Amino acid sequence: MLNEFIAIRRELHQIPETGYKELKTQAYLLDYISKLPSEHLEVKKWRTGILVLVKGTNPEKTIGYRTDIDALPITEETGLPFASKHPGNMHACGHDLHMSIALGVLTHFASKPAKDNLLFVFQPAEEGPGGAKPIMESAEFAEWRPDSIYGLHIAPEYKVGEIAIKPGLLFANTSELFISFKGKGGHAAYPHLANDMVVAASAFVGQMQTIISRNIDPMDSAVITIGRIHGGEIQNVIAETAYLDGTIRTLSPETMEIVWTRLKQLAKGWEEAYQCEVEFHPGSDYYQVDNDPVETEAFIHFLEEQYPESYVPARSAMTGEDFGYFLSEIKGFMFWLGVDSEYSLHHAKLSPKEEAIPFAIDVLIHFLESK
């Protein structure tokens, strides 16, 4: 018999929606939650997200658990019988698993409340433009603000049954990068009468990598990746405009500031050298996921006692996650949940092993009961 929460995952997988458009997802979650025992539950909507408070039997504090609910603008290529029914959208980062796990834990505590209050945060827009910071600033969250908060993220590189975590920095600071170049277009045969923005932008791609190699401490780490470049409209016309879209990843806020300062300095030089206008356009910025050492060590001890084969020491990763905003103000941690997939996060063929769902539910129930 198919596990109930694996079945839920498959239903959620078919209705992927991007940030702040998670209307079907929200409706699905609300419908499920409405069927749970309601004696100890309070439910609030926040935009396309949901907050659920499970009132404790003798509460002295509130413990938070957060899951993200949005999907990515990726065309699915898994070939699964329960593949996305929303063309161009896919749960390619495991948020369908995240939600089903959260529902599994919530279902348990709705029937068997813990001593303390539990707050379940179903957060929209993790993939962009970022939902963690605005939901934290909301009146709805403020009323039920937890004293600690936890979360997980699937990890294709770990086996089912493995949990990877470390105290301190787990995920990097991330900043989306959108740059436009505006020059002077013209006929392809007369480059001397134009300012070619394809040339300017492509040269900028290479030059910005010197920031990493020459401006960042070799004992530190940072990444600038350009994932999309667009310039011009037709093959025999010199491009008047060009655009670079990418991301910056650093292991500290200070290093992020260095990268941005140098990018802007380079841009000023580019304007002079290529006789163009260079403009940076706003994108999402995500704060590092910095696990509280005391909370994390307590969880590691819990795993070693209760799930001795599961704990794997993690390394810091350049992955970005806006859960970092929660941890910047509230003690807690995030961990990697192994799902053993040959394809990476954000890949059109990502197919996590679903056995990770009941395993994670079991771990989280026992951990939260121990708090």
Swiss-Prot record:
- Tell me the SUPFAM superfamilies matching this sequence: Bacterial exopeptidase dimerisation domain, Zn-dependent exopeptidases
Q: Which Pfam families match?
A: M20_dimer, Peptidase_M20
Give any single GO term for biological process: diaminopimelate biosynthetic process
Q: Which residues form the active site?
A: D68, E127 (proton acceptor)
Pathway, per UniProt? Amino-acid biosynthesis; L-lysine biosynthesis via DAP pathway; LL-2,6-diaminopimelate from (S)-tetrahydrodipicolinate (acetylase route): step 3/3
Q: What is its EC number?
A: 3.5.1.47
The GO molecular function terms of this record are:
N-acetyldiaminopimelate deacetylase activity
Disulphide-bonded residues: none
Q: Report which reactions are catalysed by this protein.
A: N-acetyl-(2S,6S)-2,6-diaminopimelate + H2O = (2S,6S)-2,6-diaminopimelate + acetate
Q: Which NCBIfam families match?
A: amidohydrolases
Q: What is the protein's known function? A: Catalyzes the conversion of N-acetyl-diaminopimelate to diaminopimelate and acetate.
Which HAMAP family does its entry note?
DapEL
Q: Which family does it belong to?
A: Belongs to the peptidase M20A family. N-acetyldiaminopimelate deacetylase subfamily.
Q: What is this protein called?
A: N-acetyldiaminopimelate deacetylase
**Organism this protein belongs to:** Listeria monocytogenes serotype 4b (strain CLIP80459)
